[in-house]
Structures are given as structure tokens and as C-alpha cells.
UniProtKB/Swiss-Prot annotation:
It comes from Prochlorococcus marinus (strain MIT 9313). The keyword Membrane applies. One of its GO terms (cellular component) is photosystem II oxygen evolving complex. It comes from the Bacteria. HAMAP family: PSII_Psb28. It is a peripheral membrane protein. Part of the photosystem II complex. InterPro entries: Psb28_c1_sf, PSII_Psb28_class-1. Pfam families: Psb28 (PF03912). Keywords: Membrane, Photosynthesis, Photosystem II, Thylakoid. It is found in: Cellular thylakoid membrane. Belongs to the Psb28 family. This is Photosystem II reaction center Psb28 protein. The keyword Transferase does not apply.
Length: 117
């Protein structure tokens, strides 16, 4: 269930926070206005057999509202689901800034850091 004390969460089914923290990689266009975030969730709880059919997108929820993407793809190993790969695309500097505000809140909630490669 959603945790009222969290300021940022990721959900694949509305109302159910995903506890598995993803690896996130960002890429931006040369002018910096557009780009994407690639999320990789290894063995997320949403892929359990009892919840598998409930994925409706990825919802990034924080105090400002929510960001949504429907680009959610499953990775299978030996016929069994092993990971989710999710792409979130932004198309303006304002969209990027909004995504980064969510990312900072999400990182703080999950004890994560940020590194630039």
C-alpha cells in the first residue's frame, strides 16, 4: 500500500508502492531540452504471479502530483520474468526540471545518491 510518510514513490498499479529501487540512467539531447530516463527494476514485486497482470504503467508520485509513462517492458530469463525496463521521456527543459525534482525526492526517500558519469 502507499506509504503516507513518503514524499515520493513509484507505482505500477495505482495505490501500491513498488519497494524495489531501480537503477536509473539519464540521457539528454545535445541542446539539453529533451531526453529520457531508463529505469531497470531487477525482480520487482509487481512481477510476482499474483500481481503480474496489474501493471498499467509507471507512476512517479510526489507532493507535486505524478509523472506517468506507459513504456514498461518486461525482461524474461528462461521463460520467467526477471526485470522491468521503463522509459520516461521528457520533451522540454521544464519537463526535465520536474523529473529531477521527483528524482531528488525519490532518492532522499530511499537513501540514494546521484553520480554523473
Amino acid at each position: 500500500m502507499a506509504n503516507a510518510n513518503k514524499t515520493a514513490a513509484i507505482q505500477f498499479t495505482r495505490g501500491v508502492d513498488e519497494p524495489v529501487v531501480p537503477d536509473i540512467k539519464l540521457t539528454r539531447s545535445s541542446d539539453g531540452r529533451t531526453g529520457r530516463a531508463l529505469f531497470v527494476f531487477d525482480q520487482p514485486e509487481i512481477m510476482a504471479p499474483e500481481t503480474w497482470a496489474g501493471i498499467t504503467g509507471m507512476f512517479m508520485i510526489d507532493e507535486e502530483g505524478e509523472l506517468v509513462t506507459r513504456e514498461v517492458n518486461a525482461r524474461f530469463v528462461n521463460g520467467k520474468p526477471s526485470a522491468l525496463e521503463v522509459t520516461y521521456i521528457w520533451k522540454s527543459e521544464a519537463d526535465f526540471e520536474r523529473f529531477m525534482r521527483f528524482a531528488k525526492r525519490y532518492a532522499a526517500c530511499n537513501g540514494l545518491g546521484y553520480s554523473q558519469n
